[in-house]
A protein has these predicted regions:
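His/Asp/Glu-enriched, well-ordered alpha-helical/loop segment
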Residues: 191-209, 225-237, 242-332
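Histidine-rich, glycine-flanked metal-binding segment
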Residues: 1-12
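Divalent metal-dependent hydrolysis catalytic cores, especially in the metallo-beta-lactamase
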Residues: 21, 37-66, 81-94, 121-133, ...
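Active-site core of metal-dependent hydrolases
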Residues: 115, 119-247
Length: 350
């Protein structure tokens, strides 16, 4: 065995991104295998050794094409991160909290629809983000959580009471905490708690944060770390195709059905600049930003990008930490989390 000199550097577990839509100019929904490989490899070179390609609300036709391509891409391991499973973000969302999701395809969950999608995917779906207040969403949570799918609450106008009920029906996680979710509202003077408050109130809920320093400003990152059990926090990129691709015009979603966005100031925005349209973040930047801006330790930031997501996705028996018997997915980086070396399954990525 060869010896690698890491003097003055850190060795960490590979990063695990459970919520990303693309990068390197490609979206996972572009409709061809090559786009999946390009996006995955872009993220690999920034430290993501395990990735859960994420879809957007779309037609089932586009969704099934994405699933087909994911299955093909999974068979290609050369110079690739581990494609651990798919994260379906949509189509069962609240229209009022849709963010940049395509309203034309947003609908309520029916067993005929979601079981058709689930069965078509043939075990590829690891996670599904749903608005739990929709008619049929509780039954969906019951059915899919029993099948091993992580049920996550996202793009939702639910009340805290809705979330309380959703927890009884298999929902355990909040999709991009603070983004696309309700907060306290007033009705006849009375305060009604929203999903954000539920994230703090219910210890059993895990949350994920886009730690690009833009979606959540530094003080908000600090507050989340102060108020929520840090073992229940994962970092995500929620990156779109513009990750690693520079500023200017881009497209959110598939080239065919997606919408135009603008990348500036290190973030993607809707053309009228009224709201963000996903990040252009990579996992190394997530860790670096949390570490530098939120006043937490590098070890804690790394855990939130490795062991915590591994536990969330129930793959921590072989991923997420450096331990005997686990996959040798390793990173070597400096004090500023500039990646120097990457190993997937013990093989160095050049």
């Amino acid at each position: 065995p060869s010896t690698i000199d890491c003097t003055g550097l850190y060795v960490s577990p590979g990063f695990i991104d459970t919520h990303t839509h693309g990068g390197g100019g490609c979206d996972f929904m572009d409709g061809d295998v090559e786009s999946i490989l390009t996006a995955a490899r872009l993220h690999l070179h920034h430290g993501t050794t395990t990735i859960f390609p994420t879809t957007l609300t779309s037609s089932n036709e586009d969704l099934f094409l994405c699933i087909d391509n994911f299955k093909k891409a999974r068979g290609i391991t050369e110079n690739m991160p581990h494609l651990a499973g798919m994260h379906l973000e949509g189509p069962y969302f609240s229209p009022t909290e849709k963010g940049a999701q395509n309203e034309d395809y947003i609908r309520t969950p029916s067993p005929e629809d979601y079981m058709h999608i689930y069965e078509y995917a043939d075990g590829c779906i690891s996670r599904w983000s749903v608005a739990p207040e929709l008619s049929g969403a509780m039954e969906m949570g019951d059915r899919l959580s029993k099948l091993g799918v992580l049920m996550s609450i996202g793009h939702t106008a639910a009340t805290c009471d809705d979330v309380k009920e959703a927890i009884q029906h298999g929902y355990t996680h909040l999709t991009h905490f603070y983004s696309g979710m309700s907060t306290i509202t007033r009705k006849n003077g009375y305060r009604i708690l929203g999903v954000i408050e539920a994230g703090y109130l219910f210890d059993e809920l895990s949350v994920e944060i886009i730690s690009d320093g833009m979606h959540l400003p530094p003080d908000l990152l600090k507050m989340i770390l102060k108020c929520k059990d840090n073992n229940k926090i994962s970092l995500i990129t929620d990156s779109m195709r513009g990750a690693g691709a520079g500023e200017g015009k881009s497209i959110l979603g598939s080239l065919k059905e997606g919408q135009e966005v603008i990348i500036e100031d290190g973030i993607a925005k809707m053309p009228d600049r009224t709201c963000f349209a996903g990040s252009v973040c990579t996992t190394d930047r997530c860790v670096r930003t949390l570490y530098k801006l939120a006043g937490t330790s590098l070890e804690n930031a790394v855990r939130m990008m490795s062991l915590n997501p591994a536990k969330l996705m129930k793959i921590d028996d072989h991923k997420g930490s450096i331990a005997a018997g686990k996959d040798a997915d390793l990173l070597v980086f400096d004090d500023d989390v500039n990646i120097k070396q990457i190993f997937v399954g013990g093989k160095e990525i050049k």
